[in-house]
Amino acid sequence: MGRTPPVADNHGHVNPVKGLGPREVARRFRRTGGWFMGVVALLTWDLDLRPGDLNDVDRLYRLTIESARVIQGEGVRSVAIIGLHPAECVRLIEAGWGLDKVRGYMVKAIDLAAQYIKRGEAVGIGEVGRPHWDVGSDVIKLCNEVIEYALTVAKDLGAVVHLHLERAGEATVKSIVEIMNKVGVRDRGKVILHHASPGMVKPGVENGLTPSVPIGRHGEFEEAIRQSRLIVVESDYIDDPRRPGAVIPPWRILSRVNQLLQLGIVNEDDITSIMVDRIEELYGVKCS
């Protein structure tokens, strides 16, 4: 076995308010072969911001963008993906907001993200989508409308979208493809199935989407790679000191990759394709 290729994290979070923060995360990741990290907006309340306040949404976006800049400054390529998690919808409904008001608020949050993307400060919208837990059909309908709007805006901007969804295999993928067809999404590879289950990989790839597979969940990458090599991987790191073992941190991706190489589950060409080639194609960055 030769030199291990550089490793990438397609979807992770950093918390400059309560966590290790972008600088320390970047330094740890770089020391362990990390070359790229997609930095995705956290929930507003993770940063002591108020759900339902567009001014605080703007602060959330600016903190995410600045975190990506700090990571870039530490020698790890980084891009910002900004938007509101579907849990924000649920939180506002629980607070007594009507569905129309929540919908309007989420649309404004996407429009705000679009302004940053137009200026080149962010590259995508996310994570938007549907709750992965049980909610009422009215909430699902609302979230689907938000997804449709996000895909429409992203299509016009040429931006990526990180979708947070339930993990129901082909049924989940089919529902997203229907929305994409309605919108007329052309570059389907820019629609990223965040936290994709193995059952979402084959139908996702067959429909041109990009499954982003959590590399730290036991057995899931191994099953996913049997379905297709046309994937990316993520840590979904949350940078929460209260939950240090919730997910794999970015700086442990390399050891996981080495384990997979030693077991013969993947080879170096597979890792280069997943960790370098696919990331370069998605985000227009270069690993050097």
PLM region descriptions:
Residues 2, 26-33, 64-79, 110-123, ...:
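Acidic (Asp/Glu)-rich catalytic clusters
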Residues 11, 125-127, 154, 236, ...:
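Conserved, mostly hydrophobic/aromatic
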Residues 114-198:
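Divalent metal-binding pocket/active-site signature
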Residues 164, 229-247:
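Short acidic/histidine-rich active-site segments
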Residues 14, 43-44, 84-88, 129-132, ...:
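Active-site-proximal loop/turn and secondary-structure-junction residues that shape catalytic pockets
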Residues 6-17, 24-59, 73-88, 123-124, ...:
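Divalent metal-dependent hydrolysis catalytic cores, especially in the metallo-beta-lactamase
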